[in-house]
From Swiss-Prot:
Positions of ATP binding: G30, N31, N32, G33, Q34, G35, K36, T37
Family that this chain belongs to: Belongs to the RecF family.
GO annotation terms (biological process): DNA replication; DNA synthesis involved in DNA repair; double-strand break repair; SOS response
Record carries keyword DNA repair: yes
InterPro entries per UniProt: DNA-binding_RecF (IPR001238), P-loop_NTPase (IPR027417), RecF/RecN/SMC_N (IPR003395), RecF_2 (IPR042174)
Cellular location(s): Cytoplasm
Domain of life, source organism: Bacteria
Naturally occurring in which organism (per UniProt): Geobacter sp. (strain M21)
Organism classification: Bacteria, Pseudomonadati, Thermodesulfobacteriota, Desulfuromonadia, Geobacterales
Main location: cytoplasm
Protein name: DNA replication and repair protein RecF
GO cellular component, one term: cytoplasm
Function: The RecF protein is involved in DNA metabolism; it is required for DNA replication and normal SOS inducibility. RecF binds preferentially to single-stranded, linear DNA. It also seems to bind ATP.
Keyword list, A-Z: ATP-binding, Cytoplasm, DNA damage, DNA repair, DNA replication, DNA-binding, Nucleotide-binding, SOS response
Length: 364
């Protein structure tokens, strides 16, 4: 899977861009604030219809503009397709080969991407929202039904919270029953992904670290009896919701569910957040991204496009080398941003292209 052409119109500070990326390594360099991350954001949006910065539609449109357009030509198995996302303040529209997609499931999967940003390096030591965000992105790529399951859960959660905010008990049981059923679908899909990724994680971590440390990744239910959940998931969630009923009325929001769950990262049987060194934590996240890439490659029988946003400043020389060696072995396309070419050993990257970005313009 390769992005052969990219065209942008009025996307943030990238006004009129036409780009023909190389099939392997593409390095974009320039000072901060010139548009490097915006370029990666446009590719991510072309694949997922979302901004990885969690930006509103209006923020994606250039100042004074009415809309933004992101269009790309994607090649897979020698077949090319043109995909496009039109961004307006009131919403987005997706097209494949000029045909408007009424079902987004028909749009997703034409371009698969894996994102690696400085934010994700802090995933181990950061808050649970960072880990949930990573997990949701990762699950969705190979399980398109997950998006529907999560949106259904989010709608039910919103309605239940609306009742809790006004301390309305009438009707809460109906929404609680729906919440539990929707939550189980989300949790099931999240756990299934972690089971698959966990088998790959150890091998990549050992390759990076060069030692026999053991790593674990587990799903942690917030406020739910894990043993009871293993026996009777629905009853475990219902029991937890009953136990937190007073807290929910006081806070005006739902205290139990996938929106509160977390991931546990373990190293040698202890929590990586508390006991792993900074270097070990970075190795863990790097191994996690490698496992994600491998999982997507197996899922689609084609590697995803990798987006590396200023990672050379976050990884030390050894980990950078390990990552690049991993990428060299795979027929995957990579987009790298950096403030200086000195941060990337370009001469060691085969089939590389470099682009300078200045004030929203790309200079070859």
């Amino acid at each position: 899977m390769k992005l052969i052409k990219l065209k942008l119109a009025s996307f943030r500070n990238l006004q009129n861009i036409e780009l023909a990326p190389g099939k392997k390594f593409n390095v974009f360099y320039g000072n901060n604030g010139q548009g490097k991350t915006n370029l990666l954001e446009s590719i991510y949006l072309l694949a997922t219809m979302k901004s990885f910065k969690q930006a509103r539609n209006a923020e994606l449109i250039a100042f004074g503009g009415e809309f933004a357009l992101v269009k790309g030509t994607v090649e897979r198995d020698q077949v090319r397709r043109e995909i496009a996302v039109l961004i307006e303040k009131q919403g987005k529209k997706a097209k494949v080969d000029a045909k408007l997609m009424t079902r987004l499931d028909d749009f997703f999967g034409n371009l698969n991407v894996v994102l690696f940003t400085p934010e994700e390096i802090s995933m181990v030591r950061g808050g649970p929202d960072l880990r949930r965000r990573y997990l949701d992105r990762a699950v969705f790529t190979c399980d398109l039904g997950y998006l529907t399951a999560y949106h259904d859960y989010a709608k039910i959660l919103k309605n239940r919270n609306a009742l809790l905010k006004v301390n309305e008990t009438a009707g809460i049981e109906v929404w609680t029953e729906q919440l539990v059923q929707a939550a189980l679908l989300v949790i099931e899909r999240r756990k299934a992904y972690l089971d698959r990724i966990g088998r790959l994680l150890q091998g990549f971590y050992s390759e990076i670290s060069g030692n026999d440390e053991t790593v674990q990744i587990e799903y942690r239910l917030h406020g739910v009896d894990a043993r009871l959940f293993a026996e009777d998931p629905a009853e475990a969630l219902n029991q937890a919701l009953r136990a937190h009923a007073a807290e929910e009325r006081r806070r005006g929001s739902t205290a139990i569910g996938p929106h509160r769950d977390d991931l546990y990262f373990g190293l040698n049987g202890r929590g990586a957040r508390q006991f792993a060194s900074q270097g070990q934590q970075r190795s863990f996240v790097l191994a996690l991204k490698m496992a994600e890439i491998e999982h997507i490659t197996r899922c689609f029988e084609a590697p995803p496009v990798l987006l590396l946003d200023d990672m050379t400043s976050e990884l030390d020389r050894e980990r950078n080398r390990n990552l690049m060696e991993f990428l060299k072995k795979r027929e995957m396309q990579v987009f790298i941003t950096t403030t200086s070419l000195h941060n990337v050993d370009v001469d060691e990257l085969q089939d590389n292209r470099t682009f300078r970005i200045k004030e929203g313009k790309i200079l070859d």
